[in-house]
Amino acid sequence: SCVDFQTKCKKDSDCCGKLECSSRWKWCVYPSPF
């Protein structure tokens, strides 16, 4: 299973879909467009 937006995570693969695990916040975020 995976975790959704703004849910605590340890690595990118913890997050659903294209979400990434933010190293700053330690939760899943949408990838930066930049």
UniProtKB/Swiss-Prot annotation:
One GO MF term attached to the UniProt entry: toxin activity
Top-rank lineage group of the source organism: Eukaryota
The keyword Heme is assigned to this record: no
Cellular component terms per the entry's GO annotation: extracellular region
Subcellular location: Secreted
Disulfide bonds: C2-C16, C9-C21, C15-C28
InterPro entries: Huwentoxin-1, Huwentoxin_CS1
Signal peptide: none
Record's keyword terms, sorted: Disulfide bond, Knottin, Neurotoxin, Secreted, Toxin
Tissue: Expressed by the venom gland.
A Pfam family it matches: Toxin_12
Family indicated by similarity: Belongs to the neurotoxin 10 (Hwtx-1) family. 03 (BsTX5) subfamily.
Record remark on domains: The presence of a 'disulfide through disulfide knot' structurally defines this protein as a knottin.
Protein name as it appears in the record: U2-theraphotoxin-Bs1a
Classification of source organism: Eukaryota, Metazoa, Ecdysozoa, Arthropoda, Chelicerata
